[in-house]
């Protein structure tokens, strides 16, 4: 694998880990209509472009729905690295068997790394108690992939450097976000437990007040009962004696 192919291999691998179908579609369009020499002819075929466009449209929707996006990412844990490795091998088509194998390894590893960052970031967004927009995050990812692949057409090394920076930044961001999510969840649990304890204490206080009031009523009612209806035993005895 020549040095001139390395930026293409790494960039396409990184982008495939974020949105593999967009990469296949963009490279095919650039090769077919932009006459980019580095793009393999197999990616320019109509059936490949049509299939990539259909899958890209499906991912465009699924990737913007909370929790559906995480399920989609789980399914593509294998798919994206495989596509990244396949694209890298196609890009290194004239490099021989060893060169293709090395390119596939680099592309697959880059795709797996960026996919892990994407999946971790999205899972952090979905489980965070703080409001966050999946649509905004997904749209940002799509635009970033399109921008980096477009830059690779004119400045491959600059695009590869940008992809490396984005990968490192993504890893750091996932770590920070997960720490914030864990802290926010602990605070939320603490507030929930505090409200539960306060409610339980209030219920016990109310029941204690009811018991005290009931005891007081029992202490006064017997005397009142004797006064009502002339039921005093002493009065009855006096009336019997006088008779």
Segments and roles (model prediction):
Residues 1-4, 30-47, 88-103, 152-160:
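Helix-coil boundary and interhelical linker segments in multi-pass alpha-helical membrane proteins
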Residues 42-48, 92-101, 120-131, 179-192:
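A cytosolic-side transmembrane-helix exit/cap motif
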Residues 45-48, 70-82, 104, 129, ...:
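Cytoplasmic-side transmembrane-helix entry/capping segments in multi-pass membrane proteins
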Residues 57-70, 117-126:
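C-terminal ends of transmembrane helices
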Residues 77-89, 133-147, 195-198:
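Small-residue-rich segments of transmembrane alpha-helices in multi-pass membrane proteins
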Residues 82-90, 100-121, 143:
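Mid-bilayer segments of alpha-helical transmembrane spans in multi-pass integral membrane proteins
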Residues 183-215:
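Short, highly charged, low-complexity non-transmembrane loops/tails of multi-pass membrane proteins
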Residues 209-243:
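Long, low-complexity, intrinsically disordered segments
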């Amino acid at each position: 694998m020549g040095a001139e192919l390395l930026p293409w291999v790494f960039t396409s691998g990184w982008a495939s880990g974020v949105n593999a179908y967009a990469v296949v579609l963009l490279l095919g369009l650039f090769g077919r209509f932009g006459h980019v020499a580095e793009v393999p002819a197999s990616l320019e075929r109509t059936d490949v472009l049509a299939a990539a466009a259909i899958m890209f449209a499906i991912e465009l929707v699924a990737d913007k729905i909370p929790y559906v996006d995480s399920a989609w990412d789980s399914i593509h844990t294998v798919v994206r690295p495989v596509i990244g490795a396949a694209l890298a091998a196609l890009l290194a088509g004239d490099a021989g068997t060893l060169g293709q194998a090395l390119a596939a390894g680099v592309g697959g590893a880059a795709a797996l790394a960026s996919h892990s960052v994407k999946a971790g970031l999205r899972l952090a967004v979905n489980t965070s108690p703080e409001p966050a927009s999946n649509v905004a995050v997904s749209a940002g990812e799509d635009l970033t992939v399109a921008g980096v692949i477009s830059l690779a057409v004119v400045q491959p090394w600059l695009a590869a450097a940008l992809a490396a920076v984005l990968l490192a930044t993504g890893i750091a961001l996932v770590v920070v976000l997960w720490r914030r999510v864990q802290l926010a969840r602990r605070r939320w649990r603490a507030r929930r437990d505090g409200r539960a304890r306060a409610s339980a204490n209030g219920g016990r206080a109310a029941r204690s007040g009811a018991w005290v009031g009931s005891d007081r009523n029992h202490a006064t009612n017997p005397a009142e009962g004797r006064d009502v209806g002339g039921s005093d035993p002493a009065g009855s005895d006096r009336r019997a004696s006088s008779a």
